[in-house]
Amino acid sequence: VGSEMCIRDRYYSAVKEKFRNLLTTIDFSKPVEQYVNSLLELFEGLCTYIPSSTSTKEVADISLFDHSKLTAAFAGCIYTYLKANGISDYKTELFKNSEKFYDKKAFMLYSLDISGIQKFIYTINIQGALKTLRARSFYLEIFMEHILDELLDKLELSRANIIYTGGGHCYLILANTDETKQTLDEFEKAVNGWLID
């Protein structure tokens, strides 16, 4: 156990030092929107294999990165929801009246799906099928990432709000507000219109 503690301490010290050094590469004088995703990527690279819980009585199956990313996403959604509903006394709303807040539908799980165009992937000739299949799959993945980044930009959110993306699907956690719903509706119409043209 003593040697495990020593290895763990050295590992965490190395991660902390690397984190400190990498933070110097980010220009914090710019608006937060310009560096938040870089910060998120840096955090993912360093904290994916660090458990969020240090308790030896718990199974360490959730990474510090995933825990922190989801916490940031939910915190951002709560802030947006409260702001949209004209609530500025956060302490009262979230701590003193927490039971009431838990009953509110402050969050929305949003799914984006482009897998309906799978026919595009699989209508290929036998000659060079594998190469064509890979290229079309890659194209759809890049297309999904582009759509996702555009949507996040319109919603003024970071990639922290992405719960899952892959295989032509993605899931986002969003604030359940009229403004969010309107933005989603406008975005869906624009993307569908672009795809039809």
Task: Name what the model sees in each region.
Residues 1-4, 8-197:
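Regulatory and interdomain segments flanking nucleotide-handling catalytic cores
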